[in-house]
């Protein structure tokens, strides 16, 4: 979070930062630091009410985005609704929203154990991931039934809700798209081509920005992403959209976070 703190201070803003005390640099660069876990929504809301804050934000954290929007809603500040927050931080809720909204994304099944998939007609390979984590944590590409149970347990162990998504594998080149939305109007910032370690964990290793894509492909990506932002109800925040484009040019949404990437 330190780049955000420094930028806010450079803009002349007084910064009040909340996090569990861990000796991180932001604890000293902030004007005021409060050793309160970011999951303690009520405590942070009450402290922000006492301070009389004018705005609240985070970067690169789905967990913090939940508290950010809770505080924004509680104080009548600019932010997204809690319904939007659920859809943009819980991958199962996101998949259901995409399905209902007609947005192109992989099919998925919510599970708590491999036993729940007995008799299911899975087409391998599949991707197994936690329901509620970011940063590629707990993601595994599974090539066949033998590795499924271990991948599910790994995903559950990495998540907060102790549940996993088993979803179809989307082939293609990975990209991400950054946008800013204000009062429901979406503004495109950048599209990035991503490089990863590949299976099984897909850890990001490099980026090219702007992504080297043709104008018509970029226009199609914007259309898909903007529609998906509407589906999730992202109206007042940054967003980080992850997608894949197949060799044939088909776009499939992997997930969207209602915060900076």
Describe these PLM feature segments.
Residues 1-83:
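ATP-binding N-terminal substructure of ATP-dependent carboxylate-amine bond-forming enzymes
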Residues 36, 59, 111, 192, ...:
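Conserved residues at the C-terminal ends of beta-strands
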Residues 89-172, 182-185, 207-223, 227:
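Active-site nucleotide/adenylate-binding loops and adjacent lid/helix of ATP-dependent enzymes
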């Amino acid at each position: 979070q330190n780049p955000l703190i420094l930028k806010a201070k450079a803009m002349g803003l007084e910064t009040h930062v909340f996090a569990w005390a861990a000796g991180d640099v932001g604890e000293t660069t902030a004007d005021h630091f409060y050793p309160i876990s970011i999951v303690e929504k009520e405590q942070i809301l009450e402290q922000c009410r006492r301070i009389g804050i004018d705005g609240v934000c985070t970067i690169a954290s789905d967990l913090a985005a939940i508290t950010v929007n809770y505080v924004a809603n509680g104080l009548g500040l600019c932010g997204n609704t809690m319904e939007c927050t659920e859809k943009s931080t819980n991958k199962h809720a996101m998949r259901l929203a995409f399905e209902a909204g007609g947005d192109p994304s992989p099919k998925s099944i919510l599970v708590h154990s491999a036993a729940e998939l007995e008799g299911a007609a899975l087409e391998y390979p599949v991707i197994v991931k936690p329901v509620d984590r970011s940063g590629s944590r707990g993601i595994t590409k599974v090539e066949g039934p033998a590795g499924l149970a271990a991948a599910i347990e790994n995903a559950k162990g990495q998540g907060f809700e102790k549940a996993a998504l088993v979803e179809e594998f989307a082939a293609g080149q990975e990209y991400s798209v950054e946008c800013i939305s204000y009062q429901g109007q979406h503004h495109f910032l950048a599209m990035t081509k991503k490089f990863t370690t590949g299976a099984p964990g897909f850890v990001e290793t490099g980026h090219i920005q702007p992504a080297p894509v043709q104008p018509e492909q970029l226009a199609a990506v914007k259309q898909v992403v903007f529609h998906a932002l509407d589906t999730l109800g992202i109206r007042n925040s940054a967003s980080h959209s992850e997608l894949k484009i197949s060799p044939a040019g088909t776009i499939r949404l992997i997930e969207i976070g209602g915060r900076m990437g």
